[in-house]
Amino acid sequence: MSKFDALNNQWNVPLEVSIEQLNLSVSELKDIQLSNEGLIQAIKGVFSKGFNALRVGVNKLLETEQKQLTINEAYANKLTNNALKSNYAYLMDRMVSVPAGMNTTYVNYTAHSLKMSEMFKNTMGMVEQLRSDIGRVISTEDGIKDSTIFSDAIYIKTSKELKKELDVLNKLRKGDEYNAVREYGKVFKNNNELIQSNEIARKTNTNINSIDRKKLTMSVETTMEYVKELSALAQSTGFSRQLIVKIGNAVACVAELVEAFSASVFNQEMIVKALDNVNEEISGLV
């Protein structure tokens, strides 16, 4: 039997739906009018949907596990300030590749991707923190009944920071498109911005490549097992309702972070591919 079968999770639920379901179960758990039977069902909902949210997040991560991001330096290195200094007017109206959905300049878009990658460097730490915090609840006698043994504050803080940056990203994007192109002059305010965009993208690549995605995947899977064990413990020995609410909040936050990191790898891959196309084309013209 697959380890995912134990909590009867649905396999084809998008993460945003899974997180929404988890948050709904957490809200239900706060309802002081619940009967004992209703309370048990709410507890099962928190753990099964929390488990599922982590599973969906790790499945997204598996899609990006092997990708190492790098700019094609053979083209990028040809684009020096000296080579580009007198060609901007000639290039302004030329149509060049952009990442699908980009609705700003390359410098703005790559700079935000870099900022996101700085945030994601702590993804492993957050997953391991959650695993450690849940492990402490499990290993402490009657820990499952102690509302003070677990704090969700750091997870909620990270989630708020993530959502703030995702809101910024949404403002820099429009609906996804295929074969996205823009006028050179609209995505680069001067030729130096092409060089600058390459430099920013290199830093982002380094940040993303520095995260061991295989190790992160294994850490999420171990945390999932802890969630399953905690669920069984809660149903067999009793629990603190407030504690389970905090754990549910933390699991939702970590699942969102893992999924957002996975999406950022894909987004950076699109940036690199588009920049490679621009670098190849422009290096052949100057």
Model-derived features with residue positions:
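Leu/Val/Ala/Ile-rich N-terminal alpha-helices, chiefly Sec-type signal peptides and the beginnings
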Residues: 1-107, 113, 117-120, 134
